[in-house]
Amino acid sequence: MVWFKRGIPSIKTTDKRDTPEGLWSKCDECGAALHKKQLEDHLYTCPECGHHFRISPDLYFSFLFDDGAWDEFDGQLRAADPLTFVDTKKYPDRVRDTMQKSGKSEACRNATGSMGGSAAVISAMDFGFIGGSMGSVVGEKISRAADKSVELNAPLILISQSGGARMMEGAFSLMQMAKTSARLTRLGERNIPFISLMTDPTMGGISASYAMLGDLNISEPKALIGFAGPRVIRDTIKRDLPEGFQRAEFLKEHGFVDMIVHRKDLRLQLIKLFKHLRG
């Protein structure tokens, strides 16, 4: 026997709809919740505070080259293991695992295309592959990008996004600092423009070599740029560091960076600079 009868029908429930993974991102600077489409429309910068998210080489290629069209070269190069290095895992295993998880083959990609109707070469680093560290393959790719620039008589853009040298390759990694720097002198000998774009982060052996050798050294806003990290420096000198130390704005104020350019202005600014440098 039913003692109580529901007078009003119960609220109907529907199956829970899962929000697609990766649809929303949180700004690291201001905490704003940003939709994927919103980020794409703003070239992965926060519309609220201007924070620049780290992006991969193919995204730089897509908005810097005319019509988002480019041709990649030297993508087949792979890291060797000259030291048979082992930390928590063998170096070849770490590279293989990173390739499988990220879908990337190395911490640097090279591409040719046109910018403003003229040929250009871009070599871009990727922090998502072992911290964007520079090993022998990255050094070789950057050197070949310089060679391609000479071959095409086209301006070169190097986009840095790296924690520094790749410790798993030891001295072979450090040698890339001299190798890339020497190769870039060929552009200066032929009056071919070379612009270095520093993004967050540009650290260690990268900042101590080619990242600071451009005809113009430009940066995205608030990029971390330096050799050793702030904590290491503070612990060494036993003093507090100035506000904003090693950020792009601080370096520009002290003459180490020529220009800070928002990502939305980057393409047109680079085209303008190339025309100026070409005379």
Curated annotation (Swiss-Prot):
InterPro entries: AcCoA_carboxyl_beta (IPR034733), Acetyl_CoA_COase_Trfase_b_su (IPR000438), ClpP/crotonase-like_dom_sf (IPR029045), COA_CT_N (IPR011762), Znf-ACC (IPR041010)
Domain CoA carboxyltransferase N-terminal: 23-279
Biological classification of the source: Bacteria, Pseudomonadati, Chlorobiota, Chlorobiia, Chlorobiales
One Pfam family per UniProt: Carboxyl_trans
Matching PROSITE patterns: COA_CT_NTER (PS50980)
Pathway participation: Lipid metabolism; malonyl-CoA biosynthesis; malonyl-CoA from acetyl-CoA: step 1/1
Keyword Cytoplasm attached: yes
Naturally occurring in which organism (per UniProt): Chlorobaculum parvum (strain DSM 263 / NCIMB 8327)
Localization per record: Cytoplasm
Cofactor binding notes: Binds 1 zinc ion per subunit.
UniProt keyword GTP-binding, yes or no: no
UniProt xrefs under Gene3D superfamilies: 2-enoyl-CoA Hydratase, Chain A, domain 1
Entry's Gene Ontology cellular component terms: acetyl-CoA carboxylase complex
Class of the enzyme per the UniProt entry, highest EC level: transferase
Cofactor: Zn(2+)
MF GO annotations: acetyl-CoA carboxylase activity; ATP binding; carboxyl- or carbamoyltransferase activity; zinc ion binding
Protein name, as recorded: Acetyl-coenzyme A carboxylase carboxyl transferase subunit beta
Zinc finger (C4-type): 27-49
